[in-house]
Amino acid sequence: MLMALNPGTDAPIFMSIPHLSLQDARHLQLAAQGLLTPRRAKAKPADLLATIRRMALLQIDTISVVARSPYLVLFSRLGQYDPRWLEQLLAEGDIFEYWAHEACFIPREDYRLLRHRMLDPAAMGWKFSANWLATHQQEIGQIIERIRQHGPVRAADFERKGEKGNGWWDWKPEKRHLEVLFTAGQLMVRERRNFQ
């Protein structure tokens, strides 16, 4: 039994604790994720946005065995659809990319729910480094100016100086600059090309 106080009188309100069987809990989770909803005969672009809204976000995972993970997640809910619709949603601003545990596509209307993270990026752990930002102010300023003058950039637009990197996390400085600016909400992803 749970007890709460009535806001008007401070009198106790007793509530019973809801009980879900394991089967009901599983069913509830599958339904919330849209996996129990019958598919349309043919998916439409609006269905893709509705699906992301229903899930609240779509994790961006670059692992690809059959296809990139986000495409498989959408296929499991929509069936056959045009993968370019996801890029169109991003380009049109219906979804945005940001950290929600990991990198995710998130409906535009939920931007306000994550803005506090952008305003306090130091709480984001490895995804942000105030020390990096301070140490590389000049180079970061040059990247921002380049974007202002010439438009969006990708980390791939910058050549690695010196030896080739040796692993997933051996990022060239420009990639790290862009990631820090992204985490601080100073840059947003406008589009992806080949999932970059």
Model-based region annotation:
Residues 4-7, 12-196:
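Long, low-complexity intrinsically disordered regions
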